[in-house]
Amino acid sequence: MPTLEIAQKKLEFIKKAEEYYNALCTNIQLSGDKLKVISVTSVNPGEGKTTTSINIAWSFARAGYKTLLIDGDTRNSVMLGVFKSREKITGLTEFLSGTADLSHGLCDTNIENLFVVQSGSVSPNPTALLQSKNFNDMIETLRKYFDYIIIDTPPIGIVIDAAIITQKCDASILVTATGEANKRDIQKAKQQLKQTGKLFLGVVLNKLDISVNKYGVYGSYGNYGKK
């Protein structure tokens, strides 16, 4: 199995937010016993959905749960810049298009209990790949081997991919950054996620200055669970 390494500086950053994401993971667990596959999206690019996905997966892995992090943003992956490998690794695109076996793209990491499937090469038609039987079969197979599967999706305010992915999940989380998206767009994104028929867990407010927030240290996930 190929191995990916997360940079030490990124690990240090994750550890600084450990308390917040441990609480977020606890809230996820309290929301239902059968919530295993969770999509994470945002309204716009740059709001922190990839960082949130990585931190949630890291927190579950640190708690002893066998966790898989899937980079579902095959259009414009941010995660490719976080996990590094000296080996040539295939990813989600190659598996869904039938050019590689999933076992070739399933990667171990330098974090115990955390595994990763990268996005792979850019596809000319990523939406069609996500709508394929291969994607549904992949999720159902991986459910058998992992306690939690976190999928980082493209921004739902930009493309429909996030809604397609969420239909195969158990629940979804919407990430928004302070001052990045207007209320109307956030409400529209929430509605799109709810229309998938899967549980909408709530909104994670990112890039919040907790020094001016009345919730203190809880500011980073103060909006979590508000539906």
Curated annotation (Swiss-Prot):
Protein activity control: Dephosphorylated and activated by CpsB.
Catalytic function, reaction form: L-tyrosyl-[protein] + ATP = O-phospho-L-tyrosyl-[protein] + ADP + H(+)
BP GO terms, sorted: capsule polysaccharide biosynthetic process
Pathway(s) the chain acts in: Capsule biogenesis; capsule polysaccharide biosynthesis
Organism domain of life: Bacteria
The keyword Cell cycle appears for this protein: no
InterPro entries named in the record: AAA_dom (IPR025669), Bact_polysacc_biosynth/exp (IPR050445), P-loop_NTPase (IPR027417), Wzc-like_C (IPR005702)
Pfam (any one): AAA_31
Gene Ontology CC: plasma membrane
PTM info: Autophosphorylated.
Reported function: Involved in the regulation of capsular polysaccharide biosynthesis. Autophosphorylation of CpsD attenuates its activity and reduces the level of encapsulation. May be part of a complex that directs the coordinated polymerization and export to the cell surface of the capsular polysaccharide.
UniProt record similarity statement: Belongs to the CpsD/CapB family.
Protein name as it appears in the record: Tyrosine-protein kinase CpsD
